[in-house]
Amino acid sequence: AASLAQVHKAKLKGASENVVIKVLRPNIHKQVHRNIRVMKAGGFLVNLFYKESGRLKLKEVIHDYEKTIFKELDLKIEAANTTVTKKNFSDSDLLFIPKVFWDHTTVNVLTLEEIDGLACTDIQAMDELGIDRKILAENGVKIFLDQVFRDNFFHADMHPGNIFVS
């Protein structure tokens, strides 16, 4: 998301809760449209000059990517996905999903409860605290499998900026 949005910490006016605010970058829609046009032109040229390229189905791949990237540019969709995942794991001790502040969320701005914890990349701190990384990995796999097979709903924004250990 770093290429699409910026993330800032804040405090809501008149509230005591700390939040994280994700804001789409200025002109990001224009940039994405331009990039898609370049991809389509590149795909056309590859198909034009390489007979074997037909099996790659570049037109379809680019079309699917276009649909996916424009969904990522609607932060209300991300907020809804976060809410569904929070509900799906409401009884779990393995995963904490932040609350969405819907009154402060739009297509271009997502406001979430701030989460405390160690960055999942801070191996040294986890080792110093005696966190068993094998159990952590097993729990991660269980969470993934629950999303796929139990919930049939996979919120796939798993990157180090979104995963904290506590």
What is each residue range found by the language model?
Residues 1-166:
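Conserved catalytic cores of large enzyme domains
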